Amino acid sequence: MKAKVRILDIETGRFLAFISEEDAKNAKLHPGDLVKIETAKRTIYGDVVISKTINPGEIGVTKDILRSYTFSEGEVVNLVPSETPESVRYIRRKMNGQKLKKVEIEAIVKDIVNRKLRDIEISSFVTSLEINGLDMDEIAWLTTAMAETGDMLDIDRKPIMDVHSIGGVPGNKTNILVVPIVAAAGLTIPKTSSRAITSAAGTADVVEVLAPVTHSLDEIKRIVEKIGACLVWGGALNLAPADDLTIKAERALSIDPRGLMLASIMSKKYAMGSQYVLIDIPTGEGVKVEKVEDARSLAKDFIELGKRLGQYVETAITYGGQPIGHTVGPALEAKEALETIIEGKGPGSLVEKATGLAGILLEMGGVAPAGMGKKMAKEILESGKAYEKLKEIIEEQGGDPNIKPEDIPIGDKTYTFVAQTSGYITRIDNKAITAIARAAGAPEDKGAGIMLHVKVGEKVKERDPLFTVHAESGTRLDQAIIQARRMEPIRIEGMVLQRIGNI
């Protein structure tokens, strides 16, 4: 069926083809059917939506399609019903617990990227991985398939280093220190980061306070080959595009299949051309990996996967039992990171973790002797070389290299929670801190978040400040206060924890 393109000002997060009732009847198409939209140069797939607002002979194309493909108003395309993809049969095989072949995994990933698989089929695939898992062969095939269906970066400056945290710890602005330290030592580190999904601030959200993070692959190549580093948002790039679609299914189902997590992380490192990769695995209460033995098992999988991809991988199991530094939220974290890198000193948890991770990378890259990486990283931080490199990164990405911490606007609607009793801080709940910061408006409101006045192990007196909530509106502040009162974000206990008498 021939149809003229009509561009619709609609965004749904899906590839949809809007057609008239008359055309649907003539073509024997029903809502939700998969169709091919063909031109002389390309074929894409979409789900049928029948609409009275579309005239016979037209096909409505949404912004979602236009973000990936170019169509012009009135362009003539061919609309063809599509059969169920062969990859659906492969998904059923995995649902039945069978091992998939390389070509089968490649077909599934290709069909996800081309939108031949619908949301329910992608969800079935993700669920099958959660239930039946993947062996290391399958994970390696999935990783390369995810990378090779998207763009690949080729940087001439070698060696190429990379670092990734699997997340879960609030206030993790560590890479804003790690990347400049490593680059200042002469290594190349093109760092792509994510925006927050369930956290109060992703690294990209924090960096965006200092400089633009949305750049094309060509711009990234130019920046990195000039100064050796970048801090950009990976979501603006076509890196491992299947990942975004599987993440939607994971989020909806509240699952995170281990094999898919490994492939998701390493496919982006593979696409960036990373040769030496450091994986940070925070461990502790309230993070993704709570037990050290589970962290060690995951570390072995990352290392083995790296070998199969031709990458040298090391892992760092780090303490994740409380937030890093004293701030949570984009602007608050950017301010704290900038203060630390300018002064060459700052909160112990931030400096220790940043120099620890950077030190490992310096040793991996061969610029520091074994066991001396952390010392070298601290020297680079304290000397001001890391700050100078951060200024270069900010300038090349289009920001003001002379920005100062006091220039960063913070939410001016505040409320401080105080200790109701004297004692010692025995616990700071990561999930509660994140929930309160998000209720305050983070990460969408850059100035929203939390300033912690205490850390675990510190002694407090009654009425001492515990944490301050920052918001950009009174309504958001009220929501955060309500959220904080419902939870126990900070626990205070005396030296006597419990009294037990005669029974």
Curated annotation (Swiss-Prot):
Matches recorded under InterPro entries: AMP_phosphorylase, Asp_de-COase-like_dom_sf, Glycosyl_Trfase_fam3, Glycosyl_Trfase_fam3_N_dom, Glycosyl_Trfase_fam3_N_dom_sf, Nuc_phospho_transferase, PYNP-like_C_sf, PYNP_C
Gene3D superfamilies in UniProt: 1.20.970.50, 2.40.40.20, Nucleoside phosphorylase/phosphoribosyltransferase catalytic domain, Pyrimidine nucleoside phosphorylase-like, C-terminal domain
Keyword field: Glycosyltransferase, Transferase
Statement: the UniProt record of this protein carries the keyword Transferase: yes
Keyword Glycosyltransferase (UniProt): yes
Enzyme Commission number(s): 2.4.2.57
Annotated catalysed reactions: AMP + phosphate = alpha-D-ribose 1,5-bisphosphate + adenine; CMP + phosphate = cytosine + alpha-D-ribose 1,5-bisphosphate; UMP + phosphate = alpha-D-ribose 1,5-bisphosphate + uracil
Enzyme class: transferase
GO biological process: AMP catabolic process; pyrimidine deoxyribonucleoside metabolic process; pyrimidine nucleobase metabolic process
Active-site residues, Swiss-Prot/TrEMBL: D256
Source species, domain of life: Archaea
NCBIfam families: AMP_phos, ARCH_P_rylase, PRK04350.1
Stated family: Belongs to the thymidine/pyrimidine-nucleoside phosphorylase family. Type 2 subfamily.
Protein name per the record: AMP phosphorylase
